[in-house]
Amino acid sequence: MLCTTISGPSFLEAKKQILRSLKECHCFEMRVDLLSVSCLELKKLMELAPISILAWKKPESCSQADWIDKMQSLAELNPNYLDLEKDFPEEDMIRIRQLHPQIKIIRSLHTSEHTDIIQLYAHMRSSAADYYKFAVSSSSTTDLLDICHQKRSLPENTTVVCLGGMGRPSRILSPILQNPFTYARSTGSSPVAPGQFSLKHHYFYNFASLSAQSPICALIGDTSRSIGHLTHNPFFSQLGVACPYIKLPLTPQELPKFFSTIRTQPFLGVSVTSPLKTAVLPFLDKQAPSVKASGSCNTLVIRQGEIEGHDTDGEGLFSVLMQHQIPLNNQRVAIIGAGGAAQSIATRLSRANCELLIFNRTKAHAEDLASRCQAKAFSLEELPLHRVSLIINCLPPSCTIPKAVAPCVVDINTIPKHSTFTQYARSQGSSIIYGHEMFTQQALLQFRLWFPTLSFKHLEKTFIRRAAVLASLFSIAP
């Protein structure tokens, strides 16, 4: 059940928050500790809410006697639910239950620490509560996934949410985790808890269609420069797929735990971005021919616990070049970089009868890639010395690239759309192909791997157009 947290602080602001949310949600958590309202005004707010939860977070300066009196007075307002913190005296909770048997009790714990929620639940379940809520901290994606895994072994009357920015995916996955309550803020209001989404955000991630049977798709790696969550979720919604696409920041050091965890979670597909495209290879159960050829993997397909790696980067860029009618036969093509994406692109173009030149900051890495693609290797500083018909930049925006021009320049970075490198090339008359074009083509290839039985040709133009618009919003060079 989607629940909007009402924080006011004034009566008028609280009323607006409720009225603004009524079409999207019917349950409202009144954070009485944040509201500056009278008892009569609180009653009026409750009358507006079809379902009400009253919660009052105990200040450190509050005595236990005053705390008990406060919660008893809130119970007398007859809410549908009353949230009592973990340390609220058990005997006083029982007294409230006896006096107000119609009220459902939520026993809650909020902590900024990473906690074993199974042990916590074992300790708290002796309490005569109807529901249990655990709001805990996660310091990493693997922590988050571990907590989600723990939640799946708890009864359906438990709500588990991870706080902060790292915990945001747990809020999106709430229906899949079978949380009885999913807490959100009214659209336009400030978050009450760290990482709290607005109602609008939850519906953007297809909240209404998600259930315990829904699969999960995600992006792993350095997710900071991706627009995938902004393009993929609307696409899945249009496709009628009850599946969220979430961003999971991940480092190479976290890969062993990540791969052991996703086998126990309902993951269907994973996009892999830098710096993990080669690091994931040892953890794959199967490698598609595209991965064996390039030595790079940007796509995971998970079926029945088996993880198969695919590579759609090279084919995605090749498709873009064909759409722009860029000649490759007997042409000299410069590839800047030697990482996963560069490997994929070089491998694909090595079959296009063109001469490949690999330029990289570390020349040894360029030489290694060149030896596998019948190419020539150079240091990055040598780029301006060579005349080529096409330059493909695969280095991140933070890298300084020597000024160079060619009839056509490709930058595979999606955001920012413009870089110092492409701006200079454009000023010298080069035709520029921006990263969002490769992004959409490689993503469409991923979708075909994840949803092989679905047809979505009719949605591709809208998907491509959306990516182009979003890339333009992040168009300023660093």
Curated annotation (Swiss-Prot):
EC number(s) recorded for this UniProt protein: 4.2.1.10, 1.1.1.25
Residues at which shikimate binds: 226-228, 298, 313, 442
Keywords from the UniProt entry: Amino-acid biosynthesis, Aromatic amino acid biosynthesis, Lyase, Multifunctional enzyme, NADP, Oxidoreductase, Schiff base
Location of region: 3-dehydroquinate dehydratase: 1-208
GO molecular function terms noted in the UniProt entry: 3-dehydroquinate dehydratase activity; NADP binding; shikimate 3-dehydrogenase (NADP+) activity
InterPro entries xref list: Aldolase_TIM, Aminoacid_DH-like_N_sf, DHquinase_I, NAD(P)-bd_dom_sf, Shikimate_DH, Shikimate_DH-bd_N, Shikm_DH/Glu-tRNA_Rdtase, Type-I_3-dehydroquinase
One Pfam family matching this protein: DHquinase_I
Residues where NADP(+) binds: 337-341, 360-362, 435
Associated pathway: Metabolic intermediate biosynthesis; chorismate biosynthesis; chorismate from D-erythrose 4-phosphate and phosphoenolpyruvate: step 3/7; Metabolic intermediate biosynthesis; chorismate biosynthesis; chorismate from D-erythrose 4-phosphate and phosphoenolpyruvate: step 4/7
Keyword field contains GTP-binding: no
UniProt: 3-dehydroquinate binding residues: 21, 29-31, 55-57, 171, 196
Region annotated Shikimate 5-dehydrogenase, chain positions: 209-478
Residues at the catalytic site: 110, 133, 277
Listed GO biological process terms: 3,4-dihydroxybenzoate biosynthetic process; amino acid biosynthetic process; aromatic amino acid family biosynthetic process; chorismate biosynthetic process; shikimate metabolic process
The reaction(s) this protein catalyses: 3-dehydroquinate = 3-dehydroshikimate + H2O; shikimate + NADP(+) = 3-dehydroshikimate + NADPH + H(+)
HAMAP family per the UniProt record, alphabetical: AroD (MF_00214)
PANTHER family: 3-DEHYDROQUINATE DEHYDRATASE
UniProt family annotation: In the N-terminal section; belongs to the type-I 3-dehydroquinase family.
Role played: Bifunctional enzyme that catalyzes two sequential steps of the aromatic amino acids biosynthetic pathway. In the first reaction, the AroD domain catalyzes the cis-dehydration of 3-dehydroquinate (DHQ) and introduces the first double bond of the aromatic ring to yield 3-dehydroshikimate; in the second reaction, the AroE domain catalyzes the reversible NADPH linked reduction of 3-dehydroshikimate (DHSA) to yield shikimate (SA).
UniProt name for this protein: Shikimate biosynthesis protein AroDE
Organism: Chlamydia trachomatis serovar D (strain ATCC VR-885 / DSM 19411 / UW-3/Cx)
